[in-house]
Amino acid sequence: MNTLNFLDANVWLALLWCRHVHSKKARLWFEQAGEEQFFFCRFTQLTVLRLLTTEKIMGTDAKTMSEAWGLWDQIWADSRIAFLAEPQGLEREFRTRSRLPSRSPKVWADAYLLAFASVAGLKLVTFDRGLKSGGAEVLLL
C-alpha cells in the first residue's frame, strides 16, 4: 500500500477549513493515516491559498492573504507534510496527458496532478471523481 500521499487542493482546503463540505471526512482520513506522508507542490499550495482568500468560495470565512499563510503554516508544522519540487520527467508526462483533441480548461490541472503523482510514485488523494479514471494511483475520499 502506497503511504506517500499527494493531496489535491480540494483535500488541503477541507483540512484547513472546518466548514468545507468534506472537512470531517478529510480530517478523519488524515488522523487515521498515522505516520503516512503527505505532499504538496507549488501548484496545489497556490490553489489553496487562492481559494482561502476567495469570498465566492469561502463566503464570510474568506481570509486575508496573511491569514491564509497563517493557516498554511499551522498545517505545515506537521512533520508528516512536505513540499515536493517538480520531479524529473514531469513535463513529458504532463504533455502526454494533456494533448487532447478537445477544449477543456479543467483538464489542464487534472493532467498536471495526475502526471505529477505518476512520475513521483505518489498516490493522488482527492474528492474529484473525474481523477479516478486518470490512470494513476488515486484515492477517492
Language-model features, listed with the residues they occupy:
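Active-site neighborhoods of divalent-metal-dependent phosphate/nucleic-acid chemistry enzymes
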Residues: 77-125
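Short, conserved alpha-helical segments within structured domains
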Residues: 43-47, 67, 109
